[in-house]
Structure formats: C-alpha cells, structure tokens
C-alpha cells in the first residue's frame, strides 16, 4: 500500500479519480485509504478481506493457500480438468506468473499479512464494497466492519456470483459501472462552475 501511495503522489499529484481492487487488490486499496495520504474520489473494494482471522486459523489457511498456488503452478492440467470455467484459467495464469518469482515463502508471507491485519480506519469520498451472493458468508462480516468505520459505504451484491466472478465473467459490466461513476462526477463538477 505504501508503494501505491508513493506512486500516486509522485506520478498523479496525490489524486486518483477511481480505484478498483479485487480480493488482495481490495485489501491493498483499503490500506491506501487507511493511510489517508492521497485523495481517491471513488474507491471500489470487491470482496476485500478487511478483518483478521482467529490466530488458530491463520496457520492452516495460509498453508492451504500455499498448497493451492503450488499445485496451480505445477499441476495446471489437473485444475483445468477439475474446474471447467475460464474463471479458473485466469486464476491459473496468475499463479503461473507469481509462483516462480517468490515461491512458497512469498505466498506464505502474503497470506499471513492478509489474514492477520484488520482495517482500523478508512477515509475516502465515495467508498463502495462489492461481493457476490455465493461468497456472502465471508463478505457479510467484512461489510459490517466497514460500515462501522464508514457508514456511508455503498454496498453492491451480485446475484449468483462467486469471488471475483463479476470481473472475470462480466468485465464490460465492471467497466460500465466505473465509467458511470466517472460520468456522474463530471456532471457534478461542471454543474458547480
């Protein structure tokens, strides 16, 4: 998150109109908003993990995720056979990009960070949280926590969707929603003049 803040400050003058983060990207976006050193006019966190897990669960889950990434990288054919969806093709491609550069240690460190940090505060002008109905059991506690920190959070729930599925299966819908946010902001800005 610190690197993102530095980039926004150095390259964009400290201001970003819209930011979208899915899952770990949403976690990073939440940290950028927590640091509160740049202006992000519209922030969309899609299924971002905002709460820490119980300590007893962190170890087993991070090793499970590491095994998942390792097997995605080494047994791609098995995963494609098991899951007949291009959603998993995207996941497999990501695993193949990441694993060779950091191996198990990078995956374990990443998941340890995700699973052990809790969002303590958040600042922003227009904050959105998206999730699919098939991931509600995980997303609802995140939403409750976010609403305690930022009561004006706009929640969007996508019927029949799982983790990240709206972006993978319907990228044009995500682009359309982001474009509408930009368009609505432009209308507000020109009406002030």
Residue positions per predicted region:
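Short beta-strand/loop motif that positions the catalytic acidic residue
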Residues: 123, 129-131
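Acidic catalytic loop of the alpha/beta-hydrolase fold
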Residues: 134-138, 164
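Short alpha-helix in the alpha/beta-hydrolase fold that links the catalytic acid
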Residues: 125, 139-148
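Gly/Ala-rich beta-loop-alpha elbow adjacent to hydrolase catalytic centers
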Residues: 21-29
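Conserved alpha/beta-hydrolase catalytic His-Asp/Glu region
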Residues: 55, 71-121
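Catalytic histidine-centered segment of alpha/beta-hydrolase-like enzymes
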Residues: 161-172
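Flexible "cap/lid" loop of the alpha/beta hydrolase fold
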Residues: 34-35, 40-70
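Active-site loop/oxyanion-hole signature of alpha/beta-hydrolase fold enzymes
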Residues: 1-18
């Amino acid at each position: 998150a610190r690197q993102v803040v530095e980039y926004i400050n150095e390259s964009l003058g400290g201001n970003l109109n819209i930011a979208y983060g899915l899952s770990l990207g949403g976690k990073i976006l939440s940290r950028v908003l927590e640091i509160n050193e740049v202006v992000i006019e519209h922030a969309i966190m899609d299924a971002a993990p905002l709460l820490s897990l119980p300590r007893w669960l962190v170890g087993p889950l991070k090793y499970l995720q590491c095994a998942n990434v390792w097997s995605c990288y080494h047994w791609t054919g098995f995963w494609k056979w098991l899951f007949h969806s291009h959603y998993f093709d995207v996941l497999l491609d990501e695993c193949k990009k990441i694993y060779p550069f950091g191996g198990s240690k990078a995956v374990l460190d990443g998941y340890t960070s995700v699973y052990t940090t809790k969002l303590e505060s958040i600042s922003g002008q227009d904050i959105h949280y998206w999730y699919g109905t098939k991931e509600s059991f995980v997303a609802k506690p995140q939403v409750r926590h976010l609403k305690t920190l930022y009561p004006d959070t706009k929640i969007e729930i996508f019927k029949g969707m799982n983790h990240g599925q709206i972006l993978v299966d319907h990228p044009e819908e995500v682009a359309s929603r982001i474009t509408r946010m930009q368009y609505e902001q432009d209308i507000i800005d020109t009406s002030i003049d």
